[in-house]
Structures are given as structure tokens and as C-alpha cells.
Amino acid sequence: HVCVNCAGVGSAMKTVGRENKPHDLGVFNMVVQINLIGTFNVARLAAAVMAENEPGEDNERGLIVNTASVAAFDGQVGQVAYAATKGGVVGMTLPIARDLAPLGIRCNTIAPGIFNTPLMNAAPDKVKMPLIEMTQFPKRLGNPPEYAAMVCHMVENTFLNGETIRLDGGIRMQPR
């Protein structure tokens, strides 16, 4: 049994913006609720169900795959809420894996870079091209089947536990 958590919302808002206006705390809270608390909520509920499974190979009962982002490591200007929540997802990966190990449940996280999604497809080239240029190789957006292949690898490799894997073509986001 596998649970793949893919929650993600963001906001483009600086800590202190124009006219020295502070970041809207309601917006920050909404991003935390969805990206971080929502991810933990689904993980804890899925783990409770998985704990009832009959153990399979290696006595495994399940796998939870959470989705972070390269923003967890390379948050850009205006991404404080998003980067904080995705950093939180990375930060809870190992403790969740340790908590669930006695139950035979693994937990890993994928930190994708810039992927070819409907949201990114709607972005103008002037937004997409600089992001593609920051990618080392291959110089393109990631494709959803590549994310799915990483999930499949995590399913098949039962020795992989408590890890966050960047799936990003080597991108290192610049501050802007």
C-alpha cells in the first residue's frame, strides 16, 4: 500500500512588501495548513490504515511518499511561506520514518524542481525560460512520468527509507 502526498499551494509575498507592509499572516497560515499540516494529516491517517495491513516482503506494511520542493533548499524572494512549508515536509521525513519503522511502514520525500504541469504550461515563456536555464541537465522542465518513476523506484526499493531525493535536473534556484 502506497500513499503519495502531492499537496501544494504558494503565494508570492515578501516578508515585508511594498510600503513596508508585512506579509499577510492569514495567507502564510493558509499555505502552512495545506502544504505542511495537510501533508502530515494525510500521512498520519494513511499510516494508521497501513498499520493494519498484513506484512509483505521485508515485513513491510506500506510506504508514504511526501512531496516537498527544491524551494525547501533554495527558496526564492517572495517564497517564504512556500519554502517554509516544503522545508517542514523535508524536516518531518526522517522522524516519520523512525516513528513508523516498528510498524513496517516507510516514509520518503521527493523534492521536485520545475515540472511540466498545467500551472507551468500556463506560464509565459519569459517565466519558464529562466527556470529552464537554471536547470543543469537536461535543460527542460521535468515531466510527470519522471516523478511517477521515482515513486515506483521508492516502492520497489524497500531499503530506501527516511530520505529526501531532489528530482530537479540539478537546478539550484537563484534568489530571484
Q: Regions from the language model: what does each represent?
A:
Residues V31-Q33, K126-E146:
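Catalytic Tyr-x(3-8)-Lys segment
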Residues A101, R106, N161-E163:
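Short, small/polar-rich loop/turn modules that mediate ligand/substrate recognition or access, typified
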Residues H1, V9, K21-N41, V65, ...:
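Catalytic Tyr-X3-Lys loop
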Residues A48, R98-D99:
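Alpha-helical segment proximal to the catalytic Tyr-Lys
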Residues N143-L167, R172:
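C-terminal substrate-recognition "lid" of short-chain dehydrogenase/reductases
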Residues S69:
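Residue(s) in the substrate-gating loop at a strand-loop-helix junction
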Residues G10-N29, A48, E52-D58, G78-A81, ...:
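Conserved mid-core segment of classical short-chain dehydrogenase/reductases
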Residues A43, T85, T93:
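Active-site helix of classical SDR
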